[in-house]
Every structure is written in structure tokens, then in C-alpha cells.
């Protein structure tokens, strides 16, 4: 028995509506409900002095060939700019290091919702790569909601310089998206 339910994905809300005729509200992922100042409290500044590009392919174990293609592209971009490569797809990183590595990256190449989120929060140059594998909806929807869906790349991209993103406009749009989510969550937590 629940008093309130919300979802983080519009496509799931649409599926539930199709089965039940009940429209469930879609709220932002909790990582987006706070701004960079909140995330800065857990930052590991040891990453600040390094110059590197980040790769994070969340589905590595299911698609090693895709990871290999992405890593090759990242290595080409790194060589072009004289950067090191940090591959978050391999190894175990704490939440602090994951967030910190993205915060201080010169550029992020990812197929991950959360790497996209933190790139946006910290205004990092970004290549979000759409694989058309059914796992792209969350970050594709987010980028479209922030009016930057045009930065999405397909796996065959060969750019060496990330697309320009007007992060002031992005953060303004994110603030507008954040308000109804926080209002809904606050209303759910009020005592009856």
C-alpha cells in the first residue's frame, strides 16, 4: 500500500498508463535534485591537477566490442589533445572518485545516464553516445529535456572536439525541471 509513487523515466510512466490508465508523475533522478555545490562536498581534489578524458561505458560486460570501439575513439581524442585516458568502465571507483573524475575531466565520452548527469552538473565537455540498444532512453530524454539533444553522437562519430554546450541555458533549464520534482517529493513527505 503506497500513498505516493513517482517514476524517473517517462517511458515507464507511459507503459504503466497503458496497462492501468493511471498517469504516474515523472520526477528527476535524485542526482539531479541538487546542484554542483552539494556534490562539491564529496569531491576528491587529487584529480584536479590531471588532464584527461573519461570513458564510461556502463554495459562493458555485455558489449565488449562496443567498449573497444569507444576506447579507440577516446584514445584518438586523447592523442589529439595530449590528454591521458581514465576508463571508468573498468576498476572499482568510489562514489567520491566517480564524481570527482568527471568533475575534473577535460572531456567525457559515455553511454551512461549518470556520467551524462555529472557532466551536466559540472559543465564538462561531453560526447554522449547513443547506441540504439534500448538502454539509451534515460540520458536521451534528459538531454532533450535540457534542449541539448543535438549533442548526441552515434557510435560511428569521429569528432575530436566535443560539441559546444551553453551550460548557462542548460542549468537554467535544469533548475526549471528541478522545481516540480522537489515540490512533488516534498508534498509526499508531508504528514497527513
Where are these predicted regions, by residue range?
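Active-site anion-handling motifs in enzyme catalytic cores
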Residues: 1-192
Amino acid at each position: 500500500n503506497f500513498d505516493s509513487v513517482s517514476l524517473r523515466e517517462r517511458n515507464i510512466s507511459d507503459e504503466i498508463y497503458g496497462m492501468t490508465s493511471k498517469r504516474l508523475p515523472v520526477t528527476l533522478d535524485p542526482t539531479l535534485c541538487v546542484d554542483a555545490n552539494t556534490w562539491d562536498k564529496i569531491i576528491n581534489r587529487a584529480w584536479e591537477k590531471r588532464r584527461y578524458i573519461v570513458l564510461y561505458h556502463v554495459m562493458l560486460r555485455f558489449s565488449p566490442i562496443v567498449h573497444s570501439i569507444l576506447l579507440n575513439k577516446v584514445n584518438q581524442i586523447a592523442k589529439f589533445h595530449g590528454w591521458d585516458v581514465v576508463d571508468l568502465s573498468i576498476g572499482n571507483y568510489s562514489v567520491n572518485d566517480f564524481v570527482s573524475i568527471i568533475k575534473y575531466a577535460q572531456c567525457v565520452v559515455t553511454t551512461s545516464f549518470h556520467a551524462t548527469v555529472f557532466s551536466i552538473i559540472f559543465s564538462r565537455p561531453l560526447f554522449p553516445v547513443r547506441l540504439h540498444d534500448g538502454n539509451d532512453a534515460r540520458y536521451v530524454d534528459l538531454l532533450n529535456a535540457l534542449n541539448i539533444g543535438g549533442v548526441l553522437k552515434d557510435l560511428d562519430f569521429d569528432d575530436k572536439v566535443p560539441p559546444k554546450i551553453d551550460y548557462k541555458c542548460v542549468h537554467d533549464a535544469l533548475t526549471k525541471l528541478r522545481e516540480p520534482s522537489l515540490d512533488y517529493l516534498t508534498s509526499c513527505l508531508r504528514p497527513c
